[in-house]
């Protein structure tokens, strides 16, 4: 993951030193103008269509750095036509859908705005993925 420029997310409940280093790394990324790519579900489950509840980290960073969110959804599809000739037949093809930017309103209180960003992003991504019934809420908080 580090070779690809990834930074592991530390467990904030057990290692405050690691969390401090993590936040310092993102401050440096922001200073350099780098993009952040975060899976708000905290991990990715291949082939699982519903969107699980989102963690608040990506939305907190959007608010902290006053940067827009750009929702992206990865969906899978069966290999058909010419694509059946290339690659392992059991591996599906991927479709990446990019949504509309969501801008943080830093005039609002952080906690309320982070929750709004999470709700809007979750709803947009459910729609982008073509999910008609998603069994999961946008977050576990307040449930």
Predicted regions and their residues:
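Non-catalytic C-terminal accessory region of glycerolipid acyltransferases
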Residues: 19-143
